[in-house]
Amino acid sequence: MGSISNNSGSEDCESREWLPSGESPAISSAMFSAGVLGNLIALALLARRWRGDAGRRAGRGNSISLFHVLVTELVFTDLLGTCLISPVVLASYARNQTLMALEPERRACTYFAFAMTFFSLATMLMLFAMALERYLSIGRPYFYQRHVTRRGGLAVLPTIYTVSLLFCSLPLLGYGQYVQYCPGTWCFIRHGRTAYLQLYATLLLLLIVAVLACNFSVILNLIRMHRRSGRSRCGPSLGSCRDGSGTRRRGERVSVAEETDHLILLAIMTITFAICSLPFTIFAYMNETSSRREKWDLQALRFLSINSIIDPWVFAIFRPPVLRLMRSVLCCRVSLRAQDATQTSCSIQSNASRLTFVDTS
């Protein structure tokens, strides 16, 4: 996927059978290697966490976090997409043929375009499911405890795959069309001929907005939980703080910390996908008669593909110790302000309690 001649017209790109001279598979090979390695590392870390969580929680009867079930499904989706898409591009470079010429009747081109649209949509739907799970866990805890289960989380993956399959099969039924783009190593939805490309891009945008809205709501609820935990420190100072109330406060602080870690991880993945999807969205809404170049089309596809490479590395890099450090940095200013407010509030309540005690005595 090297440099592309700007003199090549769209019709030539759609019908060419041989790759232009000077094309190199270096970038595609690097992306494939990084994607496979990152996803395998992430799956190994998730498997280790699953075993550790199962061992620690066996005595308490708690199931493994539903959030990590969804993360595992996301990493599995990214790995599956990388392994099913990248080898087609590498085969094209190895034979010096375009996707149109790899298989008769454009089968390789159709397969590549369908797989790209399918896994991109499935990834965004997985991120939306993760954001919705966090929103229900924090914002609607009663509904979450009664209706959201680990078994339901296991059903998310086949449901998302079914929805993505139905939506991405529309070009195979005549609504939209897959075509080859320069330099001949990738195919996607035809630009400017039907509304399907704009519909696909709009769906991705709506999902991104929904994920951001869920994350924003979770942030507001976490701030409220943090303030409540700060105010609870001003509770009765006699025997009540030595029994169950202290345990409840510790549990609430642990809950806030765990939810904050999940939110940081989800926010990074969401921002990454939004950045990677932006060039594709611009590509989808640009007019066919604009001054766009084939190289811009290729860069938009690369950005869309990079997301499945970055996601597992985000999970592998942002381990619990790193998340705790980030949480401490992000919450430092809030904690200092809350501490001052709490000390002031506690002093007022303490003085009021003393005055009440003097009056009653």
UniProtKB/Swiss-Prot annotation:
Q: Name one Pfam family in it.
A: 7tm_1
Q: Which UniProt keywords apply?
A: Cell membrane, Disulfide bond, G-protein coupled receptor, Glycoprotein, Membrane, Receptor, Transducer, Transmembrane, Transmembrane helix
Residues with glycosylation annotation: N6, N96, N287
Locate the transmembrane regions by residue number.
24-47, 66-91, 112-132, 152-176, 199-223, 263-286, 300-323
Question: Could you mention a single GO BP entry for this protein?
Answer: adenylate cyclase-activating G protein-coupled receptor signaling pathway
Q: Which GO terms describe its molecular function?
A: prostaglandin E receptor activity
Places the protein is found:
Cell membrane
Record topological domains on the Extracellular side:
1-23, 92-111, 177-198, 287-299
Where composition is biased (Polar residues), the residues are 1-10
Task: Provide the primary localization.
Answer: membrane
Q: How does it sit in the membrane?
A: Multi-pass membrane protein
Q: Which residues lie on this side of the membrane: Cytoplasmic?
A: 48-65, 133-151, 224-262, 324-361
Superkingdom is: Eukaryota
Q: Does the keyword Glycoprotein apply?
A: yes
Kindly indicate whether the keyword Disulfide bond belongs to this entry: yes
According to the record, the residues making up region (Disordered) are 1-21, 230-253
Query: Any S-S bridges, and between which cysteines?
Result: C109-C187
Q: Which GO terms describe its cellular component?
A: plasma membrane
Checking InterPro entries in the record gives:
GPCR_Rhodpsn (IPR000276), GPCR_Rhodpsn_7TM (IPR017452), Prostanoid_rcpt (IPR008365), Prostglndn_EP2_rcpt (IPR001923)
Report the protein's function.
Receptor for prostaglandin E2 (PGE2). The activity of this receptor is mediated by G(s) proteins that stimulate adenylate cyclase. The subsequent raise in intracellular cAMP is responsible for the relaxing effect of this receptor on smooth muscle.
Q: Which family does it belong to?
A: Belongs to the G-protein coupled receptor 1 family.
Protein name as catalogued: Prostaglandin E2 receptor EP2 subtype
What organism does the UniProt record list as the source? Canis lupus familiaris
